């Protein structure tokens, strides 16, 4: 959410920065928070440092107490318009009303926060980017943490992906549904690879199928990756059987056949991106003054461009998806590939997933030989078990 879009014209807009801290030191739970209210130019107008003596308090509770205190002070100072600068995704969602608190203590604190906001003309929740969060630490958190009563050492975490054990706690990423944690850099690289593969963006943890969301991970990615993710989300909303691709090789934009049908009559369609007309039935550029049957009769063989594409595909060992006819090139990795239409097939032979034995360690897999080898191995294990049993019996009765 952009502040400039919601800032009333001619009205001064203030910023509220808040941060809660909880740590366990010498078998004692220490907690405290800092608050800073800044002007338009991020000049510090007010700061507050408070320690909390409660062995049962949680970090989320401390963060909300800090926010509540900051809003109270803003009202006391006569401020009417203020931005609530959040660096905690869940708190941002709570204040925006996107998420609902599960714990009663959090619900009570959130109720107080929303009640105080009613005394302000406008209070805009803003989710800080990583760079903005660093700036917030520079002129707000650092300005108050040096005077805060508790002394909290930098907490280090270990990433389960890269195994780096010297990562600051605020650089760790937690997957909402599974709770798995890894460093932000590993999450970023994982999402980038998944986007380039066209695969589902799941938790980076091994064999975890929990889905990641762009809202949760957007601040970790570049604008280009965010745009790719946004487009991928839109594409996934189109049913597989309703997908149609622009035949223009320089475009290949994915579209919904149902939506295109509502804009045109007959089989002539126009690409929503490049504008080139095409036949939705033949999946080729528009054949003027020819019906589909007439076009197929006059063009029984592939066009010159189709022939070039076929020769290039043979030369590069490309595979064509049997479902949507899209060409796919595998540069590296597993030979079981997933087309952008969702169809999975073997890159080596082109068969549908599960219909061949490629990728099992041998390309010339012989089932008879395989079964024979397995039987020999089992027989070998049985012989070893018998020998071990005989030795144990001899030792027992000798």
Swiss-Prot record:
Binding positions (Zn(2+) 2): 246, 251, 271, 274
UniProt source species? Arabidopsis thaliana (Mouse-ear cress)
Write the Enzyme Commission number(s) for this entry: 2.3.2.31
Q: How is the cofactor bound?
A: Binds 4 Zn(2+) ions per subunit.
Cellular compartment(s): Cell membrane; Vacuole membrane
Any Gene Ontology CC annotation: plant-type vacuole membrane
The pathway entry for this protein reads as: Protein modification; protein ubiquitination
Q: Which residues bind Zn(2+) 1?
A: 159, 162, 183, 186
* Needed co-factor(s): Zn(2+)
Substrates-to-products reaction catalysed: [E2 ubiquitin-conjugating enzyme]-S-ubiquitinyl-L-cysteine + [acceptor protein]-L-lysine = [E2 ubiquitin-conjugating enzyme]-L-cysteine + [acceptor protein]-N(6)-ubiquitinyl-L-lysine
Q: Which residues cross the membrane?
A: 374-394
Tell me a Gene Ontology molecular-function term this record carries. Answer: zinc ion binding
> Which residues does UniProt mark as catalytic?
334
Record-annotated residues binding Zn(2+) 4? Answer: 321, 324, 339, 341
The residues that the entry says bind Zn(2+) 3 are 279, 282, 287, 292
Zn-finger (RING-type) residues: 159-207, 159-208, 321-349, 321-356
Positions of IBR-type zinc fingers:
233-292
Q: What is this protein called?
A: E3 ubiquitin-protein ligase RSL1
Result of knocking out the encoding gene: Enhanced sensitivity to abscisic acid (ABA). Decreased seed longevity.
Q: Mainly resides where?
A: membrane
Q: What is the lineage of its organism?
A: Eukaryota, Viridiplantae, Streptophyta, Embryophyta, Tracheophyta
Membrane topology, record value: Single-pass membrane protein
């Amino acid at each position: 959410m952009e502040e400039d879009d919601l800032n009333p014209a001619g009205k001064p807009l203030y910023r509220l920065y808040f941060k809660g801290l909880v740590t366990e030191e010498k078998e004692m739970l220490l907690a405290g928070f800092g608050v800073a209210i800044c002007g338009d130019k991020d000049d510090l107008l007010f700061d507050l440092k408070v320690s909390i003596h409660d062995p049962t308090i949680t970090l989320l509770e401390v963060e909300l107490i800090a926010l509540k205190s900051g809003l109270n002070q803003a009202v006391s100072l006569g401020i009417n318009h203020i931005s609530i600068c959040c660096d905690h995704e869940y708190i941002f969602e709570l204040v925006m009303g996107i998420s609902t608190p599960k714990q009663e203590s959090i619900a009570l604190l959130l109720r107080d926060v929303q009640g105080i906001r009613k005394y302000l003309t406008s209070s805009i929740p803003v989710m800080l980017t990583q760079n903005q969060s660093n700036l917030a630490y520079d002129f707000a958190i650092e300005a108050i943490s040096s005077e805060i009563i508790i002394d909290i050492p930098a907490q280090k975490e270990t990433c389960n992906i890269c195994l780096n054990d010297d990562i600051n706690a605020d650089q760790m990423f937690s997957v909402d549904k599974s709770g798995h944690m890894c460093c932000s850099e590993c999450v970023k690289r994982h999402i980038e690879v998944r986007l380039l593969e066209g695969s589902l963006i799941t938790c980076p943890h091994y064999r975890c199928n929990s889905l990641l969301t762009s809202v949760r991970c957007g601040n970790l990615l570049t604008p280009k990756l965010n745009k790719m993710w946004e487009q991928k989300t839109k594409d996934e909303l189109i049913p597989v059987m309703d997908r149609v691709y622009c035949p223009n090789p320089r475009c290949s934009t994915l579209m919904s056949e149902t939506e295109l049908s509502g804009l045109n009559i007959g089989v002539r369609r126009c690409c929503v991106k490049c504008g080139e007309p095409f036949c939705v039935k033949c999946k080729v550029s528009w054949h003027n003054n020819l019906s589909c049957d007439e076009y197929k009769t006059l063009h029984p063989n592939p066009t010159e461009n189709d022939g070039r594409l076929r020769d290039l595909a043979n030369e590069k060992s490309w595979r064509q998806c049997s479902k949507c006819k899209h060409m796919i090139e595998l540069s590296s990795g597993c030979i079981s590939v997933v087309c952008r239409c969702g169809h999975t097939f073997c890159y080596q032979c082109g068969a549908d997933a599960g219909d061949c034995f490629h990728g099992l360690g041998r390309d010339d897999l012989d089932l008879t030989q395989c079964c024979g080898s397995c039987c020999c191995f089992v027989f070998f294990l049985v012989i070893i078990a018998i020998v071990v049993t005989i030795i144990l019996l001899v030792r027992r009765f000798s």
